[in-house]
């Protein structure tokens, strides 16, 4: 997963990651985060387009998984978090913490703060 901060701050791109852009939309409606023991593995945004419809952005990263001897690659339970933004709410600040990978990501809106991960 990669994340690039605003132009007036230093760039932050996780090791091996690439910068991404979901395009132009009216507003962010929902943010979905997957994480595992190492940190944030996937970020996905739902947007409101110009007609008022909800559009799902691309998955940036991969869902966390573990290996099971009987079933192979299986999803990790409880490793997903998401939040919906209210109609009058918008993101003002995004902060990511990490080095080799994104360990924690924080979204601050005009009304609330959401933390994902747990490592500073």
From Swiss-Prot:
The keyword Transcription regulation does not apply. The keyword Zinc does not apply. PROSITE patterns: JACALIN_LECTIN (PS51752). It comes from the Eukaryota. Residues 6-120 form the Jacalin-type lectin domain. Keywords: Lectin. GO terms for molecular function: carbohydrate binding. Belongs to the jacalin lectin family. This is Jacalin-related lectin 39. The gene is JAL39.
């Amino acid at each position: 997963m990669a994340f690039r901060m605003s132009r007036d701050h230093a760039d932050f791109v996780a090791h091996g990651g690439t910068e991404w852009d979901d395009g132009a939309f009216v507003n962010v409606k929902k943010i979905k985060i997957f994480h595992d023991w190492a940190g944030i593995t996937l970020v996905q945004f739902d947007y409101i387009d110009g007609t008022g419809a909800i559009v799902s952005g691309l998955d940036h990263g991969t869902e966390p998984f573990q290996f099971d001897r009987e079933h192979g690659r299986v999803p990790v339970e409880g490793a997903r978090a998401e939040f919906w933004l209210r109609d009058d709410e918008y993101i003002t600040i995004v902060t990511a913490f990490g080095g080799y990978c994104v360990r924690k990501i924080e979204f601050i809106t005009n009304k609330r703060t959401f933390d994902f991960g747990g490592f500073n």
